[in-house]
Amino acid sequence: KTKEELFFDNTKLIPDWGNYEPERLKVFLGESSREDVAAGAQKRLEEVLSELVANAVEKTGLKKVVLSGGVFANVLLNQKIKQLPKVEDLYVFPAMSDGGLALGSALYFLSKLKIKEGVKLLPKSFGMVYFGPSYSDKEIETDLVRNKMVYKKITEPAKEIAKLIYDNKIVAFYTGRMEYGPRALGNRSIIYAPIDPTANDWLNKKLNRSEFMPFAPVTTIEQIKENYIGITDDPLVAKYMTVTYNCTEKMKKEAPACVHLDGTARPQVIKREDNPYYYDIINEYYKLSGIPTLINTSFNMHEEPIVASPEDAIRAFLDSGIDYLVMDDFLCGIDDNKHLVK
């Protein structure tokens, strides 16, 4: 419950604190906890941005809204905007923060070139944002050998990985091109069964992350309406983990590790055409468990970037003590590589 003094003056975008020196803030906030401060700030953010978007929709008559900028990494804010009565559809650029300027600048330059040619570029959606570096099997195996890793090649990777997850093993999954933007979307991910409500505590500790950092689910598109309230048949905004949805009772019961305290979750909705390998793992797990969802969290240690190279993946795997590392079709178990753990 937020403290009353944190409901800011609605005539101002920010509270009138005079300045932001820590000692003055402490006096202003009094005995308010960090959680109360965060809740108050979140509420005010939602109020201000919702008013701005509603005003823009009213003035322009345009009901399909595109959001970009670092503030829209706030997925609960995005849900509030999506639920505005006059917003027909919502899209959040996957690399919504400053990193998105690279693609935005390139598209802007391209549009200028095309205008000179008499061609107008029209908006269109793109597929998955696997725009980063990739490494061949030969490069991966070279790094495994150089690091003296014990490994094997698996012949039916989706089935074998799904079985490991079904047996409550944590899998660090590395394949193909790295994701563009802040979200791990299956090519640099740690995946795990969503059934343990305490996973948020112990898995975050294993990764040296803050205990309040929640995990997100990845769900196959065929089953999304059973799990998320108000979701459409093909939600582009949910492809990149950029918005929360209220969860059904079924989702809360079957995948409690992915559901926030307020009953929402930040899903990645996956089609097979988007990432066949990743989709097949989730689908094979669904066949074993009856649950079409896995935990998907970024493959990195706390305050480190998502792993990019095979060398990064090997180091993070050994540092974390995660049960298994899969790189393309190569499988490494932590028990087989304890001689390398520092």
Listing of model-derived features with the role each one plays in the protein:
Residues 26-38, 42-47:
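Helix-hairpin-helix/helix-loop-helix acidic hairpins
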